[in-house]
């Protein structure tokens, strides 16, 4: 099939084929290989890395799906990883939920998923569980992604908005608000 069909979200054979041929292959890791409805994470590893858990979720519903420097998939990984990292945690695990519009080209989904896998792998993050739903044509705008991420916060780090004081120095890796401005620039 060249396009997403309602059957890809029905829990049947088409959905299993999509999961196995795309998601399992791209996001391959031991947690996904268990093929359970949840990821079973090793608490000892997280405890060894810190004394608190940073946990965040975000949804991505942008248009266009592809833009200079990235796409909705890369944005989903980077955005959620950043939300976890600003606490001082090292992002380790992500869940990923897709809402796909019937008729979405399979090549579009594959490009987004491949980008997500590459971005997560480069950051040392495992996508350990996920979900896929397909809605009727017109009920969504091509592709929506929800991610949730977690990582352990080292015991000696206590970052947060409430700890900021006048004179603190903030490090940023680019122009503030740049990604929002860039997305708007390409939709007008």
State the predicted function of each range.
Residues 1-184, 188:
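Helix-biased detector of long, well-ordered alpha-helical tracts
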């Amino acid at each position: 099939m060249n396009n997403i069909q309602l059957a890809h979200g029905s829990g049947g054979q088409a959905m299993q084929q999509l999961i196995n041929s795309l998601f399992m292959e791209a996001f391959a890791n031991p947690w996904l290989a268990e093929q359970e409805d949840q990821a079973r994470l090793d608490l000892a590893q997280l405890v060894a890395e810190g004394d608190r858990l940073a946990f965040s979720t975000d949804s991505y519903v942008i248009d266009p799906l592809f833009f200079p420097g990235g796409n909705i998939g890369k944005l989903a990984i980077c955005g959620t990883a950043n939300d976890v990292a600003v606490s001082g945690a090292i992002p380790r695990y992500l869940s990923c939920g897709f809402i796909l519009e019937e008729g979405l080209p399979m090549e579009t989904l594959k490009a987004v998923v491949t980008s997500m896998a590459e971005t997560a792998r480069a950051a040392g993050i495992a996508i350990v569980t996920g979900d896929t739903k397909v809605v009727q044509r017109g009920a969504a705008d091509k592709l929506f992604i929800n991610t949730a991420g977690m990582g352990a916060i080292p015991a000696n780090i206590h970052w947060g908005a409430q700890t900021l004081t006048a004179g603190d120095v903030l490090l940023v890796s680019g122009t503030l608000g740049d990604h929002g401005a860039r997305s708007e620039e390409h939709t007008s």
